[in-house]
């Protein structure tokens, strides 16, 4: 009998609601002509039951997002419960909270400090912020980085890099760090969700991906900070892997291995980018589509064109879920980066 083993980390998407309309958003329920089933959102009590079950199954660390997590009534109670239940088990790992910061306030930041929450806030460009999000709030995001710094809360600057904001990446990263961000997470734009309707205007060229890495290394070296690229890049797409000392690049997919995702209705997916539901938090077993889960859990997805590559054991050939979204199988090519 095939058994699905849950990773140690989970991302809880607490709500579908969002007060931005980001062109690059990869939430599967916002894809054009989406067939993704938006079920009724779990209540706060439901989420507490989910958290307890996950701890009992060996999950140790949590991140929470949406949609926009600050729009979920009672999200504070869920945070407290995660911390409380973790404490019973001797766990005090930071809870990562991902927000666009539009509804942020100082009381929330004080709460995050109290509960050992690591706050990640999105700044997809400065001059192009409104063009990307539909909202004019870049200065608002920078303000909350300042407040978090003053109150001693650790933060991450989250930048989705697109063709539209590529030219201002130096400025965007610099502003985030100057205003108090402790580190940086870069994500190259990936087709998925609402972003499928904006691929031509947002998708980076392979040359721009290398330029993104060069700019990130330059800014981080000046600031003496560290950063990460959160979306996989194939090794063969990078001109000089060895020169990057401050920006850390992911080459392998962590879906169903390092983490998994639970959507607002309790449905389980291998990653936040994926539209493929593999189970539900309240079902037994939780993972029902074992074959799809294990494709990711066991890294059984290398494209045929990469099978003879000497680097195949340390590179997943780009984002496997993009391959599935664009071409119908995680074993196909990630054409967002490999031409």
Task: Pin down the residues of each PLM region.
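C-terminal accessory region of radical SAM enzymes
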Residues: 207-243, 267-317, 321, 326
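Short, small/polar residue-rich loop motifs at catalytic or cofactor-binding pockets
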Residues: 253-257
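Short microdomains enriched in Cys/His and/or Lys/Arg
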Residues: 43-50, 287-290, 326-339
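The −1 position to Zn-ligating cysteines in a subset of zinc-ribbon hairpins
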Residues: 17, 21, 252, 305, ...
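Short, acidic, Ser/Thr-enriched surface-loop or helix-capping motifs
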Residues: 262-263
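Radical SAM/AdoMet-radical enzyme domain recognition
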Residues: 31, 39, 44-65, 72-190
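Short, basic/aromatic recognition patches
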Residues: 242-251
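Canonical Radical SAM [4Fe-4S] cluster-binding loop centered on the CxxxCxxC motif
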Residues: 2-44
